[in-house]
Amino acid sequence: MEQQKIPQATAKRLPLYYRFIQNLSLSGKQRVSSAELSEAVKVDSATIRRDFSYFGALGKKGYGYNVNYLLSFFRETLDQDDITRVALIGVGNLGTAFLHYNFTKNNNTKIEMAFDVSEEKVGTEIGGIPVYHLDELEERLSNDIQVAILTVPATVAQSVADRLAETNVHGILNFTPARLNVSENIRIHHIDLAVELQTLVYFLKNYPQ
C-alpha cells in the first residue's frame, strides 16, 4: 500500500472492503456495485469509487465490480498470503481476550507469543499461545515478529515501547492511555477505549440522528 502512495484514510478502509468482498465470494456472488458496497460497509459510493480509482480500472461502468477479481486484487494488495506474526505484551483482561480471539479466523495476522509478569500466567498457555515473562522479551522476540500489541498498565507502556524499539518490531498497536515516543521507523496506532467511549457519548448528546 505504501508503494501506491494512496491516502492513509483510503488505506484504513481497504481491510473493510476486503472482509466484505470475502463474504460475497463465499456466498457465490459474482459481481457487486458501488451502491451495494456502500450499503454494506457504510461508506458512501463516491468515496468507494475514489478509493478504488487509486488502483486503476477495478470495475466497469454499468456492470460494477467482479467479486473474484476484487478478492484477488485486495488479497495481493493487503499481503493476505503472508502471515504477520504478532507479540502481545500484557496479559490482563483485555490481553487475555485477544489471546482467546487471535486473528487468523478473519485475516493473516497471528499472535505467536505473549508476555506478562504474573507468576500465575507465565509458563502457561492461553488460547494456545505461550506466555513468557517480560524479562525474556528481547530474547524471545524473533526477527519474524514485526508487530506488538500493548495491553500493559500505562505506567510501564513507554518503558516496554523502548525495549521493543531495540528489536525487529516495526509496528505497535497501543491500547494504553499513554502516548508513546518512539523512533521514526516504528509506526504506532493508538486505541484508547475510554476516549472512544467518551467520543461516542458526546456525539450522541450533541449530534442526535
UniProtKB/Swiss-Prot annotation:
GO BP field: negative regulation of DNA-templated transcription; response to redox state
GO CC terms: cytoplasm
Localization annotation: Cytoplasm
Cystine bridges: none
A GO molecular-function descriptor: DNA binding
Binding site for NAD(+): 90-95
DNA-binding region: 16-55
Function field: Modulates transcription in response to changes in cellular NADH/NAD(+) redox state.
UniProt xrefs under PANTHER family: REDOX-SENSING TRANSCRIPTIONAL REPRESSOR REX, REDOX-SENSING TRANSCRIPTIONAL REPRESSOR REX 1
Complex formation: Homodimer.
Protein family (similarity comment): Belongs to the transcriptional regulatory Rex family.
Protein name (Swiss-Prot/TrEMBL): Redox-sensing transcriptional repressor Rex
Gene field: rex
